[in-house]
């Protein structure tokens, strides 16, 4: 429903094309073909491999196909029915497929887990690639050394933390810092008119997201509820830790420690990706299905779905209400508008 209404999608690469669909510059078949091309590779390589190797549902397997379904569907009811069918199909087929693969003489599930390792590492490199793409090799080399240093510190002194989540956070902070420094340096020569025009554009786009707030809040509630049911892992930095926490035979104390470790890794990843998600939302008027992904953290730490659902709805609502203030702050640093799409590219 969210993707059909162009209110929110999971894939950041799809969000910039949805305004073209809303404004009538593109039909659903064209937009759907783009969405399919951008998403199908992640579904096959990340979504399926993560789920089969951990036994947990994940965002890529659930939300990327529903992005495609919603964009292609000709009406709301068709989008709702097909999306529901996909969710039921994925949920009911997970256990039989897992049993089939474990019965084979070859360890396919272990191989799929190894296949996903480079994907996890690649996510951590996104900010560094963005710095190189936007600001050149000198800044990217310095940033790479700082990110490497942060990884060494985490591995050496904080082995309970997921190093890739810290790498993403440090990399995005460096990306933000370099962009803000560039704006402050160039502010004296920049015309003030450009700075004033950005907030007005953000205000218009933010209002479109706020108009879809009830549906987005319901989605946030459902995501948090599912994340609390021990069948779902939100992202690459938490899903394998969650699989260990939910494994049979583990003590409650060890499970709680792993859950908090997964929640912390997810929280750090969410902080790192706030600039990308927020600026894309403000520029397009299309939000992310899971928001800043803090609804995952709420679900991991909630003792029951009944507590997770209202908490998730509140969290994603607060995120949307804060978008207006984030837009005003970002309007002071126009360079961030050009920097934030670089990780997505």
Q: What would you call each of these model-derived segments?
A:
Residues 1, 168-283:
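Membrane-embedded hairpin module used as a gating/binding unit in multi-pass transport
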Residues 1-49, 69-70:
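N-terminal signal-anchor module of multipass membrane proteins
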Residues 6-21, 104-115, 198, 202-206, ...:
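Hydrophobic alpha-helical segments of integral membrane proteins
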Residues 48-58, 109-121, 262-266:
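Structural signature of hydrophobic alpha-helical transmembrane segments
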Residues 80-89, 141-150, 289-298, 336-337:
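Central hydrophobic cores of alpha-helical transmembrane segments
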Residues 103-225:
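Conserved, well-structured core segments that form the ligand-binding/active-site neighborhood
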Residues 233-236, 266-329:
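Conserved mixed alpha/beta catalytic, RNA-binding, or beta-rich assembly cores of soluble enzyme
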Residues 338-345:
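Conserved small/polar residues in nucleotide/adenosyl-binding loops
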């Amino acid at each position: 429903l969210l993707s059909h209404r162009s209110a929110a999608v999971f894939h950041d690469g799809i969000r910039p094309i949805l305004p073209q669909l809303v404004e009538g510059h593109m039909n659903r078949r064209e937009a759907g073909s783009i969405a399919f091309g951008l998403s199908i590779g992640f579904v096959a390589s990340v979504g399926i491999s993560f789920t089969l190797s951990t036994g947990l549902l994940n965002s890529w397997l659930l939300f990327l196909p529903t992005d495609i379904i919603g964009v292609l569907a000709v009406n709301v009811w068709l989008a709702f029915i097909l999306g529901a069918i996909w969710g039921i199909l994925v949920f009911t087929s997970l256990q039989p497929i897992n049993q089939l693969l474990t019965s084979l003489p070859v360890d396919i599930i272990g191989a799929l887990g190894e296949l996903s390792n480079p994907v996890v590492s690649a996510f951590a490199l996104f900010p560094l690639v963005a710095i190189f793409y936007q600001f050149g090799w000198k800044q990217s080399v310095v940033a790479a050394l700082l990110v490497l240093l942060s990884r060494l510190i985490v591995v050496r002194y904080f082995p309970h933390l997921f190093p890739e989540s810290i790498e993403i956070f440090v990399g995005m902070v460096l990306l933000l810092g370099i962009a803000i420094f560039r704006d402050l340096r160039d502010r004296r020569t920049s015309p003030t008119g450009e700075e004033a025009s950005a907030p007005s554009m953000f205000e218009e786009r933010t209002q479109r997201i706020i108009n879809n707030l009830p549906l987005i809040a319901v989605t946030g509630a459902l995501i948090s509820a599912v994340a609390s049911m021990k069948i779902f892992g939100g992202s690459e930095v938490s899903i394998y830790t969650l699989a260990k926490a939910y494994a049979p035979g583990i003590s409650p104390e060890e499970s709680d420690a792993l859950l908090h470790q997964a929640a912390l890794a997810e929280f750090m990843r969410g902080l790192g990706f706030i600039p990308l998600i927020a600026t894309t939302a403000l520029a397009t008027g299309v939000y992310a299905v899971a928001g800043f992904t803090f609804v995952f953290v709420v679900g991991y730490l909630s003792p029951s779905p009944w507590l997770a659902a209202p908490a998730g709805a509140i969290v994603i609502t607060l995120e949307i209400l804060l978008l207006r203030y984030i837009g005003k702050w970002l309007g002071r640093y126009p360079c961030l508008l050009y920097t934030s799409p670089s990780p997505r590219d």
